[in-house]
Structures are given as structure tokens and as C-alpha cells.
Amino acid sequence: MSSKSGGAKKKAGDGRKIIADNRKARFNYSIGETFEAGIELKGSEVKSLRTGQGSLNEAYAQVTRTGEVMLVNAYIPIYLQANQFNHETRRPRKLLLHKREIEKLAAAVQRQGMTVVPLRMYFTDKGRVKVEIGLAQGKKLADKRETLKERSWERDKARLMREKG
């Protein structure tokens, strides 16, 4: 369900317009705690995101030594009308979090060997771009297979219920 201009998809209920969803992260990692972070963007990046483009595949967040959280390898395509004022498509972008949240992320990454993974990027009601990030632990191959089996069973169960009822 997207707008007529082919822009970001609107999710029913909470008023968020989802730009990008990192479905691969939920398969490859078991997600623990999640955080909502603002993101520092250039004007051409925001306009490009308004068209509903952008990808979080292979993106990750890292805590720098200066205590900042950076979103690395997220893809935001160039905005054609920006001409010479365009941006780099995969540049590191600063995530905006409270100091306590940054300290919690840094501690989990250092002590427990967890990874900070972006889960989705969306527009709020006020038009701000937010990124939902999660503390993640990598899954083993057996866990991934188990996830596939569960999804398959849920699909089969739904199919049987549709046919029967």
C-alpha cells in the first residue's frame, strides 16, 4: 500500500511511513533490546528518502571512541534534482541517541560481543526520519534452520485453516 507518487509505504495504525526494512537482520540475528534513534541527514538524502528509496541491507551501527553511534553502509540513492549538492550513497551517518543509551550499546558490544543492527527506517508523523536499531546476537546455522521450519509450519497452518474454514 504505497502512495500515488511511489513514495514510502504507510503502515496502518501508528502513522509511520516505512522507508526501509531490514528483513535479513531478523533472520541472521536474534534481536534483544531495540532503540529508536534519530539520524543526521543532508537535505538531498531526506528528499531521496521521501521517494521511498533506501536500503538497510548489509548496514550496521558502530559506537566510535568519541562516544557517537554511526550508521555504516546504509544505502540512500542520489537525488537527481540536487545536481552538484548531492551526497555519497553509502557514507557513515550519525545516529542521535541519549547518552545513557549510547553507553548501554557500547557496553553490550564490548562485554557481550553483541552487534548493533538497524531494523527499519521510517518517517514519523512530524516528518522526521528515525531508525530502529537493535542489539543483536548472531544466530548459528541450526537456529536459522529452525526459524525456516517455524515459518514454513505457520504458512502451512494458515493455508489449512483457509481451506477448512
Curated annotation (Swiss-Prot):
Cellular localisation: Cytoplasm
In its UniProt record, a GO molecular function of this protein is:
RNA binding
Main location class? cytoplasm
InterPro entries, per the entry: SmpB, SsrA-bd_prot, SsrA-bd_prot_CS
The family database entries (SUPFAM superfamilies) matched by this protein are listed as: Small protein B (SmpB) (SSF74982)
PROSITE patterns assigned to the protein according to its UniProt record, in alphabetical order: SSRP
Q: Which GO terms describe its biological process?
A: trans-translation
Classification via Pfam families: SmpB (PF01668)
A single Gene Ontology CC annotation of this entry is: cytosol
Keyword list, A-Z? Cytoplasm, RNA-binding
Function of the protein: Required for rescue of stalled ribosomes mediated by trans-translation. Binds to transfer-messenger RNA (tmRNA), required for stable association of tmRNA with ribosomes. tmRNA and SmpB together mimic tRNA shape, replacing the anticodon stem-loop with SmpB. tmRNA is encoded by the ssrA gene; the 2 termini fold to resemble tRNA(Ala) and it encodes a 'tag peptide', a short internal open reading frame. During trans-translation Ala-aminoacylated tmRNA acts like a tRNA, entering the A-site of stalled ribosomes, displacing the stalled mRNA.
The UniProt family comment states: Belongs to the SmpB family.
The identity of this protein, by name, is SsrA-binding protein
Write the gene name. smpB
